[in-house]
Amino acid sequence: MTVRGGATLGMVEGDEFRRDPRITITSVRNSHSDLSQLDTSPSAMEPNGNNKSASRSLLFRILYWIYERRLLRQIHKRSMPRHVGIILVGNRRHGLQRGLSNPREIYRCGAEKLDDILDWCAELSIRTVTLWVFSTENLKRSPAEISGILAAIEAKITALARDPSTHRRRIRVRAIGRLDILSESIVDAIRAAEAATASNNLMTLMIAVAYGGREEIVDAVRALLKAQSAEGASLPDVIESITPEAIARHLYAAELPDPDLIIRTSGEIRLSGFLLWQSVHSEFYFTDVFWPAFRKIDFLRAIRAYQARNRRFGR
């Protein structure tokens, strides 16, 4: 079962907000007496100096804030996913909309969204999040674009390892994929981040880079066969050893739970091989929002959709 979210963008998000008779100007005034968290400075509103536009912008911000709190109240009543995977798509289209042409600038915007995701997952006590930032198929793109993507990834991973909030929130950073095809500098950045956060144990951030689902399964089978060969197993024994459980033990991050929820941004309804083996019982959520524009309410709506599912695990 799939749910498509964010197809219509309105005052806050989709027709749901506009249809709800409980959300009125009066309810905005009365629902929360403390609006101190809102930034009401002129720079946070419309920059054209028009008082009417500024008032309208402030009203929208208040309505958005109220709607976000409503979503939080709804989802806190039910169980959270343990592991959320996100397929980050839409960087280029978002960049075109903003008039950006330099790949480094385009993908830097997407990389900065990572901080928000970590904040939101920490707030909801989600223990594992996997972000697919670069696929093996992305290697077919132009050298300039590949360089821009990998430069943004390397810079963000380096920043994560040095960020005090990473350690304050006890986030462990890991990377999965065919790292051997990456440059030495990005591999060094990955290994440094993994080493710096190895003792953190409240949240795991798994970064899928140079990753492909088919490649992961092939690599797992190869690792299994190599292990059997090293033990001197006969061919019949090797054949007998190939089971779903044995393959699963040789996946890139075998010790982590399978993803409960997989989110894909930008409106494309496919997995493209993301966590191909592990997603057999995952719930999927697709949103039209481009990755750099992905907001907290988009994330909360995905969590709410997940909570509404009846997960039977084949039963």
Task: Kindly give the residue locations of the regions a language model identified.
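Flexible, compositionally biased loop and terminal segments
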Residues: 2, 20-315
